[in-house]
Amino acid sequence: MKVFEPFKINQMELKNRMVVSAMVTNYCSEDGMATEKFIAYHEHKAKGGWGLIITEDYAVTPTAGGKIAAQIYHAGRETSSAITGEQPVGPSALKDPTMPETPREMTVEEIHELVEQFGDCARRAKEAGFDAVEVHGAHGNLIGAFASPFSNKRSDEYGGTIRNRARFAMEIIENIKEKCGKDYPVLYRMSAVEYVPGGLEIEESKILARLVEEAGADCIHCSQGVYASTHVIIPPSVVPRAAYVENAA
């Protein structure tokens, strides 16, 4: 079976095609520092034979043989001032149905600044020893919100057409490649279908995938849903396994 055959993402060689998606473990300390439990969790996964592990934090060693990718993201409107200490931001001043606050629309200058910060974050991940980074553009977070007509109502160069809505993600990927090198693998995670009225559908997602590939993404990681369709992101036990695999195909 191909799933057990070696695979290559850019110059990163994987021993098989089995990948652990980034998942919140709550194993880190309250201030975000990795704990021994968190490290052991990922080491055991690597020893189990996974080809690539995508972690939600920055503290893993490669001694068990697997490759490790750091997922980087910005919550955007899917958070609250109670957590961040400031008003959430988004592509538009449009409230997420699951959140208590309306975000502030980002200025173009703020967008440019954040693009640089994503690139700097990826550079630090590379310097820390990560084999790759995953740019998280799924589930309605800031990057995903820019790409989606469900949350992006802008009328400037970052809104409207799918190319304009993808511009933020593309500029982030380009900035990462500029700072980390063309050979450094960049994965892009996206929700192929958002399952909300007016959200991303498969035809636009096909275009989005090609655009981020054009910008330099080496791998597309397909998920589905946004916070307003959480039942799709975290399906209940009655949902058949691999129910959304056709979206990725």
Residues covered by each model-derived region:
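Flavin-dependent oxidoreductase catalytic cores
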Residues: 1-249
